[in-house]
Swiss-Prot record:
One of its GO terms (biological process) is citrulline biosynthetic process. This is Ornithine carbamoyltransferase, catabolic. Its EC number is 2.1.3.3. One of its GO terms (cellular component) is cytoplasm. The keyword Cytoplasm applies. The gene is arcB.
Length: 337
């Protein structure tokens, strides 16, 4: 029998947990970050084996899960798309049962249906490292970053600008609504959240008092924002839509003019990375050659400004993932709030 409300549970989408449980994970993340900074060991997962399954490329998520597992005393094992046969030579159910017999927890980054089946059949906690619909581990890091900077969550206004129907916009809208954060989605009409996601968020907002806004009007959407948040304009697998997407989203670029439009000198900028803010990458050079664009969702000036918190946010991926794994697998005493 466990004394933890988290023990043995999977995190597939933010709605899997309650408001108080999300708040606990955020505060636990801050605590673990403090322990890390002070050099205090926290081996809550000593002797545990963690499978890291990636069918999509990853830098921050893979690095965060790997370092988090090691800090917790666990052994992480990376399995890329060439190492696993999910649904190809072996059914997801069969693979899940095998992995569940060898590993104590599984991170998976790919299709939502596969993540759900892994959780259903593996018998161990499964953590969603990113699907097309949701990015729950990123949310703990993001709202941890917000709380670090403002000392609170309730009443803070976070404005997401750009592609408003991708996984980041979905997760920010729903999670923010659960936590009492005011979420503004500022995007072209054709790139706004689905009605299903809006309805889910609205249900939570009524409970927590979140005041949300979904609009194509940049000036109205960013006014009074505490946080400006953006993501890449073209998600994985959408490269064929690049030219169309860039032309559509140019007015939604975070730049210093948009920062001024918030009217808030104490605001911050967040980005889950990677960011296309210059041409110092092969991809950036290629885009510049093809379309004459050197900056996309955020200008280099804004990216390097005093308002930017994207690297603090990236570091927090490790601390938040550590909190998620320790809470769901570490047999910790975490009573119901």
């Amino acid at each position: 029998m466990t004394n933890s409300v988290f023990q043995g549970r999977s995190l597939l989408a933010e709605k899997d947990f309650t408001k108080s449980e999300l708040e606990y994970l955020i505060d636990f993340s801050l605590h673990l970050k403090d322990l890390k900074k002070k050099g205090i060991p926290h081996h809550y997962l000593e002797g545990k084996n963690i499978a890291l399954l990636f069918e999509k490329n990853s830098t921050r998520t893979r690095a965060a899960f790997t370092t988090a597992a090691i800090d917790l005393g666990a052994h992480p094992e990376f399995l890329g798309k060439n190492d696993i046969q999910l649904g190809k030579k072996e059914s997801v159910e069969d693979t899940a049962k095998v992995l569940g017999s060898m590993f104590d927890g599984i991170e998976f980054r790919a299709l939502a249906k596969v993540v759900e089946d892994l959780a259903k059949y593996s018998g161990v906690p499964v953590w969603n490292g990113l699907t097309d619909e949701w990015h729950p581990t990123q949310m703990i890091a993001d709202f941890m970053t917000v709380k670090e900077n403002f000392g609170k969550l309730k009443g803070v206004t976070l404005t997401y600008v750009g592609d408003g129907r991708n996984n980041m916009a979905n997760s920010l809208l729903v999670t923010g609504s659960m936590l009492g954060v005011n979420i503004h989605i500022v995007a072209p009409d054709s790139l706004q959240p689905t009605q299903e996601v809006r309805d889910l968020a609205e249900g939570y907002a009524k409970e927590t008092g979140s005041k949300n806004m979904i609009t194509s009007d940049v000036d109205a959407g960013v006014k009074g924002s505490d946080v400006l948040y953006t993501d890449v304009w073209v998600s994985m697998g959408e490269e064929d839509k690049f030219e169309e997407r860039v032309n559509l989203l140019k007015p939604y670029q975070i730049n210093m003019d948009m920062v001024k439009k918030t009217g808030n000198e104490n605001m911050i900028i967040m980005h889950c990375l990677p960011a296309f803010h210059d041409i110092e990458t092969e991809y950036g050079k290629k885009i510049d050659e093809q379309f004459g664009i050197q900056e996309m969702e955020i200008t280099d000036e804004a990216f390097r400004s005093k308002y930017a918190r994207q690297f603090e946010e990236a570091e927090n991926r490790m601390h938040s993932i550590k909190a998620i794994m320790a809470a769901t697998l570490g047999n910790l005493f975490i009573p119901q709030a």
